[in-house]
Amino acid sequence: DLYGNIVLSGGSTMF
């Protein structure tokens, strides 16, 4: 949710 929200536009899969 932290970094995934920035990279995947709201998706904490990898981060």
UniProtKB/Swiss-Prot annotation:
Regulation: induction: By water stress.
Protein name in the entry: Actin
Classification of source organism: Eukaryota, Viridiplantae, Streptophyta, Embryophyta, Tracheophyta
Protein's job: Actins are highly conserved proteins that are involved in various types of cell motility and are ubiquitously expressed in all eukaryotic cells.
Compartments in which it is found: Cytoplasm, Cytoskeleton
Keyword Nucleotide-binding: yes
Similarity section: Belongs to the actin family.
Highest taxon listed in the record's lineage: Eukaryota
GO cellular component entries: cytoplasm; cytoskeleton
